[in-house]
């Protein structure tokens, strides 16, 4: 058997459905994961439209307690901008990138070392702001989402793969590679972008657990995956 695959499970937007439906399943299988949070309480904005039904965490004391508990259990919390709008990001990347890091760190008392580009929109100005803000790694998205454990990586434009309904882990996992996979809505289109049902998410995690238990896969946070590749 060659090197096991590394798999980093990531979740964008801080949607409540992720915490209510995905986290209990992740806990059941003892999988760490990375959650990229938007640093405000407004509805999610996508392509210029508001989606008030896509309920985000609202940074209440209850939510902060929930997130701190997840951190203690090995989850990673990363940043995903302040306003989740490309015009604001292009106009003031320093505020969007640095502000989201400061918001998370001040409330959760933990380092936010990872950033996720909203809509996978990466420009040199935004990338520079991410580096200057002190992040250690960030991911965009070109839908390949895997790296050989020994190939060079642009740590400030790491690729990822959006997971869709009815996908099987066996269709994309490869030994000796680091896979960064992304989830948004867990449920229906009323819950978030590109949703998969709770049943499908559970089935995918059950399949991933079989790979993990066989020694073929190690599930790690995004920052831990980056750390391991830097050492390889």
Where do the PLM segments sit?
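C-terminal domain-boundary segment and adjacent tail
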Residues: 1, 28, 33, 105, ...
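Boundary/entry segment of secreted carbohydrate-active catalytic domains
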Residues: 3-17
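Metal-dependent polysaccharide deacetylase catalytic core of the NodB/CE4 family, i.e.
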Residues: 6-7, 27-126, 145-147, 151-153, ...
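Aromatic- and glycine-enriched glycan-recognition loops and surfaces
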Residues: 13-17, 55-67, 197-202
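Aromatic/hydrophobic pocket-lining residues that form the small-molecule binding cavity
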Residues: 19, 63, 93, 97, ...
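His/Asp/Glu-enriched short active-site or ligand-binding loop at hydrolase and phosphoryl-transfer sites
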Residues: 111, 121-168, 220
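C-terminal anion-handling pockets and recognition modules
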Residues: 172-177
């Amino acid at each position: 058997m060659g090197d096991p695959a590394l798999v980093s499970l990531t979740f964008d937007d801080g949607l409540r459905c992720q915490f209510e439906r995905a986290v209990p399943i992740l806990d059941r299988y003892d999988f760490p994961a990375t959650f990229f949070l938007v640093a405000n309480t407004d509805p999610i904005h996508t392509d210029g439209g508001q989606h008030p039904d896509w309920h985000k965490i609202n940074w209440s004391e209850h939510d902060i307690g929930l997130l701190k508990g997840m951190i203690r259990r090995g989850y990673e919390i990363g940043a995903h901008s302040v306003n989740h709008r490309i015009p604001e990001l292009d106009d003031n990347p320093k505020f969007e990138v640095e502000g989201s890091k400061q918001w998370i760190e001040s409330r959760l008392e933990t380092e936010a070392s990872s950033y996720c580009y909203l809509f996978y929109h990466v420009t040199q100005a935004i990338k520079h702001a991410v580096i200057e803000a002190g992040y250690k790694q960030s991911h965009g998205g070109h839908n390949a989402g895997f790296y050989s454990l020994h190939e060079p990586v642009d740590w400030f434009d790491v690729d990822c793969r959006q997971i869709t309904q009815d996908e099987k882990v066996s269709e994309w996992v490869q030994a000796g590679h680091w896979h960064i996979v992304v989830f948004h809505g867990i449920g229906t289109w009323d819950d978030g972008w590109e949703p998969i049902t709770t049943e499908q998410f559970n089935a995918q995690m059950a399949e991933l657990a079989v790979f993990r238990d066989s020694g073929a896969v190690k599930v790690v946070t995004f920052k831990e995956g980056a750390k391991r590749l830097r050492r390889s």
